[in-house]
Amino acid sequence: MSQLAMLGGPRVRSRPFPDWPIFGDAEETRLVRTLRSGRWGRLDGGEVDEFERRFAEMHGCAHGVAVVNGTVALRVALLAAGIRAEDEVIVPPYTFVSTASAVVEANAVPVFADVDPKTFNLDPSAVAAAVTSRTKAIIPVHFAGQPADMRALAAIANERKLLLIEDAAHAHGSSYAERAAGSLGDMATFSFQSSKNLTCGEGGIITTNDAPLADACRSIQNCGRVPDGLWYEHHVISGNYRLGEFQGAVLNSQLDRLEEQTRRRDANGQRLASRICALPGVHPQARPAECTRHSYHLFMLRLESAVFGAPRRAVLRALDAEGIPCSGGYGFSLPRQPLFRDKAFGPYLVNASTRLDYSMARCPASDLLCEQAIWLGQNVLLGSREDMDDIARAFEKLYEHRHELTAAVRC
């Protein structure tokens, strides 16, 4: 192949990948209709109500409770589940900080159980080892859009009488054993932040098939009100976490696009994985048979630099030069974050601070992923089959020129 682009050679591709978000007349029509209605808040309009029903049904659930963002969705779910001071909640170390910080905001204790370095999801054996008499819930993250090992995690939860709350922020439209993500535990939370596969800029939702849990979520979402109570009658400590009608309007239109986009991402993700998995040291996220649909919020792989023949930092720079947008993801796992390493719980769990020392946490698989992971964003997977072949050719080109690549980084 030709010389590396970062050394003056031609790029593998010069065309951009699809922009994100994707929108059109449908979004504009709903937004203008909402604007002209004068019903901009959740209490007055019908867009959010419609979206809650549609999204819950699409994800195999009877109830959906929309909130202002995915972090709040996690916090509301934990409070609705009855998580209280110093309860322990098991979370993965390789995830966005909100999975654990929401536990802290609920006045509970996040306990880190390591991930499987092949799937990037919670390792059930690590979860089982982390359960104590204080444990009340497990939060598996469907990382990159691939459902966690829910059969094994559900068995642990059932045996120990624990709640199972899915963090499905990446998993809109994913499925496990033909069941939709979001319907696999007691509750699930989703995010509609700008980068997500379904977005309105900022937003979130809780899904469940448990009516009492749904009622509790709605009360916490709506200032502690209850259906039969007076307007200025408040039953629980909460806040106003209601999603607005403009966000609901965008989400309803975006939801119409989700099925086709998810099919495309899944097909392209599988094609790309099949093309690059034969390269030495390149390990795409392993896909168990139970993953019957992968939404691919991210296409993830692990790069063994010693086997591939070039360091990850050089590969990331070279891929970008070849026209392939990518990143290394998290720089360190959650126990290494200053929030947990230095501050533990700040003003929250003062009494627990003396027995918590996250500097001693051992999460070798998560730490390895922070050193080896390469991420491609979901919009890349909305391209064509030929676009996936371009990405594969870029990896092949880098492997062919691995020695020049390593030398260039040393200079």
Task: Give the predicted meaning of each segment.
Residues 1-41, 376-377:
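N-terminal "arm"/small-domain region of PLP-dependent enzymes with the aminotransferase-like
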Residues 41-88, 102-104, 111-114, 179:
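Phosphate-binding glycine-rich loop
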Residues 50-53, 62, 125, 137-141, ...:
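PLP-dependent aminotransferase class I/II
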Residues 65, 90, 111, 164-165, ...:
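Structural detector of well-ordered beta-strand residues that form the stable sheet scaffold
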Residues 79-168, 175:
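PLP-dependent aminotransferase-like
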Residues 166-200, 229-235:
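Conserved active-site segment immediately N-terminal to the catalytic lysine
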Residues 183-225, 245-248:
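Active-site PLP attachment segment
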